[in-house]
Amino acid sequence: MSLFTSLPFLLLTAVTASCADTETENCENIRKTCPVIACGPPGINGIPGKDGRDGAKGEKGEPGQGLRGSQGPPGKMGPQGTPGIPGIPGPIGQKGDPGENMGDYIRLATSERATLQSELNQIKNWLIFSLGKRVGKKAFFTNGKKMPFNEVKTLCAQFQGRVATPMNAEENRALKDLVTEEAFLGITDQETEGKFVDLTGKGVTYQNWNDGEPNNASPGEHCVTLLSDGTWNDIACSASFLTVCEFSL
C-alpha cells in the first residue's frame, strides 16, 4: 500500500481516535464525580418515553365567536324620560296668500237668513190658514182632542206655547171662530177663590162671563172654558174639554 493511498484512512483513524479520546476524557470527568457511571462509547437513541402528566389548568380564555342566537322577546317599557328642552324656533314660513274679504260672507249670510225667515213666515201663514187662527201677534191652534186642564197646560208647554188666553174682544172672537165646542182657557182662580188670573199669576183685565157666571156651582170649579157663543163659564179643572194653545208670532 502506498503512502498516498493510505493517507485518507490514516486521517479518518486519527479523527476517530481524537473524538474517542475527547469523549473518554469527558466520561472520566463525570466518573470522577459519580463513580457508579461506567464509561463507554455512546449508545444509540432509545424509544420515545411515555406522555407526561397533564399540566395545571390554564386561565379562562376570551369568549369565542359563536353563532348568533335568535332575538329574545321585547323587554318591559322603561320609565318615561324627563321632558327635553324646547327646540330652537324653525325658519319663518313664506308669506301666505291674501285672505278673502269677510264682508262678502257676512252679506251672503245675512241675505240667506232673510230668505229663510221669509220662507218660515210663509209656512206659518199656511199653517195658520189651514189649522188655526191668527190675530195680532198671536196664533191659536187646536189638535181637536179633549183632556183635563193640567194635561192641556203640559201639552202646550211642550210645544213652547200656552193655553189660549184671550186678552181682548178681538182675540176672544178669533177663538170663538176656531172652536166648535167648549174649550179650556188659560185662566183660573186656584190660588184665591173668585180672583181669576192668567197662568203667569197676572190678573185678567178682559172678561166675557156668561150670565150668572162665575157661580162656583160645584166644588173645584177653578178653571174657565169658552162656550160656543164666545162667553165664559167656570168649571172643574178635572173635567175634559177641547185643547187650544196660543203661540206668539
Curated annotation (Swiss-Prot):
Known role: Calcium-dependent lectin involved in innate immune defense. Binds mannose, fucose and N-acetylglucosamine on different microorganisms and activates the lectin complement pathway. Binds to late apoptotic cells, as well as to apoptotic blebs and to necrotic cells, but not to early apoptotic cells, facilitating their uptake by macrophages.
Positions of transmembrane segments? none
- Where does it sit, as one GO cellular component term? extracellular space
- Regions of compositional bias (Low complexity) in chain numbering: 79-95
Q: Where in the cell is it found?
A: Secreted
Composition skew (Basic and acidic residues), residue ranges: 50-62
Entry protein name: Mannose-binding protein C
Q: Which gene encodes it?
A: MBL
